């Protein structure tokens, strides 16, 4: 039993570590690339965000922090939908484990399809709403605060998250279900590939003004 638990626990823990490290590396690479692109294209960046910079009275030395702060406004809402769909995967673990133990493929298929169907409905509907209403939502929370000038920068980012959030919203339930049927090593591989792709994409695309 101990060996089985360890065999299951190691991939699960590894997945969590990779996810946390990816978020950390993501934050570091974004800020580093922002610093580089601003240093090399200061006048262009200032012309693109002239209105917001003037409204917030941003100095050249603070421009990177201002733009990164605008990006983080959208992050406040990014995890709302995945946090809901994650509970679907967790709630399905007992049924999936039981069906897998007795090799009931029909029950296994039914459980997986139900979780994915409900997860897609929730994530697509709420994601589209998040995309369409990105700026009104941000204004509702930040209109009267110091972050108000950054709303027009954060809104397109939040909209992009909204339209693609179903991918993130489905990934966690799928991870839970794979772990429930003894395939915990699969999420480790996919997370590793995703982390590498994300870091490379950050480096390439953030460097483009």
What does each model-found stretch correspond to?
Residues 163-193, 203:
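Membrane-interface junctions at transmembrane-helix termini in multi-pass inner-membrane proteins
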Residues 2, 6, 72, 92, ...:
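Interfacial transmembrane-helix starts/ends
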Residues 1-16, 37:
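Interhelical loop/hinge segments that connect adjacent transmembrane helices in multipass membrane
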Residues 43-59, 65-85, 117-121:
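Alpha-helical transmembrane segments of polytopic membrane transporters and translocases
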Residues 69, 155, 184-185:
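Residues that define the loop-to-transmembrane-helix transition and helix capping
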Residues 76-79, 114, 127, 136, ...:
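Residue-level recognition of pore/gate-forming positions within transmembrane alpha-helices
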Residues 74, 85-102, 175:
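Helix-loop junctions and terminal segments of transmembrane helices
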Residues 131-165:
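Interfacial segments at transmembrane-helix termini and the short loops linking adjacent helices
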